Amino acid sequence: MSNSMLDKNKAILTGGGALLLGLIVLFYLAYRPKAEVLQGFLEAREYSVSSKVPGRIEKVFVKKGDHIKKGDLVFSISSPELEAKLAQAEAGHKAAKALSDEVKRGSRDETINSARDVWQAAKSQATLAKETYKRVQDLYDNGVASLQKRDEAYAAYESTKYNESAAYQKYKMALGGASSESKIAAKAKESAALGQVNEVESYLKDVKATAPIDGEVSNVLLSGGELSPKGFPVVLMIDLKDSWLKISVPEKYLNEFKVGKEFEGYIPALKKSTKFRVKYLSVMGDFATWKATNNSNTYDMKSYEVEAIPLEELENFRVGMSVLVTIKP
């Protein structure tokens, strides 16, 4: 065989080998397991600044994007109705306190003196009636007075004796003042009236709403002059220091997202990668179930909601930024 034929065969073998190798590489690249990218979003804790008092908003002191400190004044409410209720509650408390003081102090000196005089008069009447009865009894024993006269004298004596006892009891009541039960009841009414004053005052303090945290104003829902219902969120705030990643994870990748496990995510908007730690996971509803297309090698997969906290402070991040998490094969 000539050298030319050998060279030709050699070239064919080399070309065939290269072609075969290329086919093998293409087959590998086509069918090798591919990395999957899951997309989640950054979220932050949101707070509503509202008031327990319904009324007309007097002024809103912040606007979207403002960074404010805890305790800063956010908005104020004008409530003339509440001020009227406070005046009413204070008047009720003054009346209840005056009544309680009167009961505690006891009867006036004039009342005590009057009760004593009535008792002394009844006592004198009883003494006179007793002496009269004794005289009539002696006359009756001697046959001078009739039985009727004696009975009348005795009845008069008994009546004046009971009148004296009743007058003495009233005198004792005047000396002792009100009963302990009356004093307790009057004091309780005073405390209840004071409680109403304190309740209205606490509501009045809430007409000036302050920031519950250090954070950023994310939205202002009402403006000055508008009516605000009780508990309505007038201003929304977010705490950018309390942020987390929320991501939907198919069931087959749950092993990569155990609670406490760390993983890396890429934030395209910030052009940086950062570490996250899983703090919570929970199954999502049936709407998030991945349905199998056949019954041979696949199954219906649930999706799980995973929340993970960043392990470093994210500068310049905004709520809603995407985070890409790559699952390696």
From Swiss-Prot:
Compartment(s) of residence: Membrane
Documented effect of changing residue 67 to R: In strain: Hp921023
Keywords per UniProt: Membrane, Transmembrane, Transmembrane helix
Keyword Membrane: yes
Transmembrane segments: 11-31
SUPFAM superfamilies: HlyD-like secretion proteins (SSF111369), Outer membrane efflux proteins (OEP) (SSF56954)
InterPro entries: CusB_D23 (IPR032317)
Family statement drawn from the similarity comment of this UniProt entry: Belongs to the membrane fusion protein (MFP) (TC 8.A.1) family.
Name of the protein: 36 kDa antigen
Lineage: Bacteria, Pseudomonadati, Campylobacterota, Epsilonproteobacteria, Campylobacterales
